[in-house]
Structure formats: C-alpha cells, structure tokens
Amino acid sequence: MVAATTLEAVDIMGLMKLLPHRYPFLMIDRIIDIDGDDSAIGIKNVTINEPHFQGHFPEQPVMPGVLIVEAMAQTAGAICIRSLGASKPSLVYFLTIDNAKFRKPVVPGDQLKIHVKKIKKRGNLLKFACEALVDGTKAAEAEISAMMVTGD
C-alpha cells in the first residue's frame, strides 16, 4: 500500500516545469518517488554525450563530483518546489555543501539513483541528507542546505 503522502513519479517534462535548469545543466532525468516534502529518489542516466566528458577526462571519462552534488541539489529542489504547488512561482537557492564524500567514480553508462531526505527545516531554510548510488553501491554522499524563495 502506498502512503497517502507519496506523490507520483515526475518525468523529464514535469521536471522542466518544476526546475529552471535546462541542458546542459539539468542533472536529473526523472524522479521515481517523492514522499511529500520529506524525501525523493531521482535518476540521472550518465551518457558519454554530456559535454563535461570532453575534458574530464577524454581518455578515462569520469563525472565531476560537483555535478553529482548538483544532481542531489536539483532532486532536493524538486521536492521543495513540488511541495509549494504550481500556484506559487518559486526558486530554490543552493546554500551549503557539508560532509561531501566521493566514494566511487561515476562513468558513462552508469545510472545514478539519488536519494534525498529532508533532515531539518526552519522557515524557508532546509537541510537534506543525500546519497548517490550506482548499482546499489554508494558513489557519493553529502548534506546540502537550500533556501526557498516564493513569488509572494
């Protein structure tokens, strides 16, 4: 049985309605689960066609860690904006990265499963615990904080 607070998955078209990011900086392809405004699981399919692989590194392409963290932040941002509803234009500003650890290289062909869980909220400030997994193995983790700004 699905919990009453669980919302349906969000495909790429839905993400483009929620997030202001576009190619080449939209770092998530879909969200497969959102539990209210508390947690989400995002998916990033890593492909060799992404522009950062031209220079990082041409002979041994590895997804830059900062882009993995950005994928975490975008997944968290989708939770925040989705929780406000479509009637309030809003942005989510990325504020801090704490305790970031990169445990396994992420390479073209990998699928990142990004788990984001809200651990603190005070007014419009939020903190999230994040993990990025490849085939069930932790590739990266971080705590991030963000600020929601509504159009009110």
UniProtKB/Swiss-Prot annotation:
One Gene Ontology MF term: (3R)-hydroxyacyl-[acyl-carrier-protein] dehydratase activity
Q: What is stated as this protein's family in its record?
A: Belongs to the thioester dehydratase family. FabZ subfamily.
- Output a single Gene Ontology CC term carried by this record: cytoplasm
SUPFAM superfamilies attached here? Thioesterase/thiol ester dehydrase-isomerase
Could you tell me the superkingdom of the organism this chain comes from? Answer: Bacteria
Function (record text): Involved in unsaturated fatty acids biosynthesis. Catalyzes the dehydration of short chain beta-hydroxyacyl-ACPs and long chain saturated and unsaturated beta-hydroxyacyl-ACPs.
Q: What NCBIfam families does its record include?
A: fabZ, PRK00006.1
Q: In the UniProt entry, which residues are flagged as the active site? A: H56
Record-linked Gene3D superfamilies: Hotdog Thioesterase
Q: Where in the cell is it found?
A: Cytoplasm
Q: What is this protein called?
A: 3-hydroxyacyl-[acyl-carrier-protein] dehydratase FabZ
Q: What lineage, starting at the top, does this entry show?
A: Bacteria, Pseudomonadati, Pseudomonadota, Alphaproteobacteria, Hyphomicrobiales
Organism this protein belongs to? Mesorhizobium japonicum (strain LMG 29417 / CECT 9101 / MAFF 303099) (Mesorhizobium loti (strain MAFF 303099))
EC class, as a word, reads lyase
